[in-house]
């Protein structure tokens, strides 16, 4: 950013927090990057990430999007250091659900230098997010087994059904044309396969239209909605 920003309130005069002046951003980010990569500093990875996230959010280097970028940096660090094979740990849902506590923890660290309570909050967020991720993976595994069994019981449509099911994990909302492409089907064959998938509860039509219909892989999406809702 090239101007002063603030957090909370309608102006600088009643802001809850005023980040550093724009002229200080460069040196502060250099310092943060140096800490980020300084392996001689003996600190556990998650504590390093917690401190770095706090510092990034305090610097607030952009006029908008600081939270999104700050959360993305958490995942990138874990992948870059080989702690995650894939970017599968995102704290956004947890932090959004506990937004007030998140902001309070950051504010307390800034106001009273109580970095310990911030680290405890952050570590608990990681624990709960990892636990939810594990639960989600287990539910997806069970769901996949159930759907595989349903498709295998589709007789002569089983082979094309397996192709469509595999496609749905990458594209959970499809049109009839996408179903045609997924298994190299004719229009009539695609409609027949869609009806088969609807009859066993794999797909649901959700537009209510006569034309240009769309079908959703509802069970798959429901697993992730359950995570967001804390189920």
Predicted regions and their residues:
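FIC/Doc superfamily catalytic core
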Residues: 1-231
């Amino acid at each position: 950013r090239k101007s002063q920003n603030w957090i909370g309130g309608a102006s600088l005069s009643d802001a809850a927090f005023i980040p550093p002046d724009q002229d200080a951003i460069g040196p502060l980010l250099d310092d943060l990057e140096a800490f980020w990569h300084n392996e001689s500093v003996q600190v556990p990875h998650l504590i390093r990430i917690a401190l770095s996230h706090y510092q990034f959010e305090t610097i607030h280097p952009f006029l908008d999007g600081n939270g999104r970028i700050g959360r993305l940096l958490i995942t990138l660090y874990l992948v870059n250091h080989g702690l995650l094979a894939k970017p599968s740990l995102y704290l956004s849902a947890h932090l959004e659900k506990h937004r007030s506590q998140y902001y309070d923890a950051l504010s307390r660290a800034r106001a009273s230098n109580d970095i310990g309570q911030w680290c405890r909050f952050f570590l608990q967020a990681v624990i709960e997010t990892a636990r939810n991720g594990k639960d989600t993976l287990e539910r997806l595994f069970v769901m996949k087994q159930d759907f595989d069994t349903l498709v295998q019981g589709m007789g002569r449509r089983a082979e094309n059904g397996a192709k469509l099911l595999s496609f749905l994990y990458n594209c959970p909302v499809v049109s009839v044309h996408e179903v045609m492409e997924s298994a190299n089907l004719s229009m009539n064959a695609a409609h027949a396969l869609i009806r088969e998938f609807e009859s066993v509860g794999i797909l649901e039509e959700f537009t209510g239209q006569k034309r240009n219909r769309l079908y959703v892989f509802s069970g798959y999406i429901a697993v992730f909605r359950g995570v967001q809702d804390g189920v």
